[in-house]
C-alpha cells in the first residue's frame, strides 16, 4: 500500500475555516490533520492534542492541598505524575516516585543532602536538595568518605574495565581512592 493512501484516512471532523472534511496527512514532522480542500484551504493542526497531561485515573479520597479538589493520575511528556483535577486553574503536581535521598550531606553548602534526580533526557544524576540556592551536582553515584589527598568530603563510584572504583569527587583532585 502506498504511503499517500495510508495518510488520507477520513476523520469525520469538519474544517473550522471552510467546513470541508479534515483528513490525516503525513508531513516532515509526522502525521497531522489537514483540510481536504488543500491548497484552496490551508488549515492544519497537530494530530495529538497539545494538552500536557491527560487524565488516566481519578484518585478517590486523595485531595489537592492547594484547592481541596480531587487528585488525578496524569500522563505527561515526562511520564506519569499526580496532579489536581482543576488544572489549569490549580497547578498542584506531585511526583509518583519520590527521588532517592541519600544521607550524604552536600559538600558545597554543608546543609543540604544529595538526592537522585533525572535530567530531561533521562540521565540520572545527584544534586543538592536545596537547589536553586545550592547548585552542586554530580553525574556519578556519591559515596560517603573523604579523599586522603585533598580531604574533600565526598567520593564518587565509577565503573571501569577493572571493576568498580572510588574516586575523589573534587574536580581539582579526581584521584582514585583505594577501598579501605
Curated annotation (Swiss-Prot):
Domain of life from the UniProt record: Bacteria
One GO-annotated biological process of the protein: DNA topological change
Parts forming coiled coils: none
Pfam families, per database record: Zn_ribbon_Top1
Matching InterPro entries: Topo_IA, Topo_IA_Znf
GO MF term (any one): DNA topoisomerase type I (single strand cut, ATP-independent) activity
GO CC list: chromosome
Family: To H.influenzae HI_0656.1.
Protein name listed in UniProt: Uncharacterized protein YrdD
Organism encoding this protein: Escherichia coli (strain K12)
Species lineage: Bacteria, Pseudomonadati, Pseudomonadota, Gammaproteobacteria, Enterobacterales
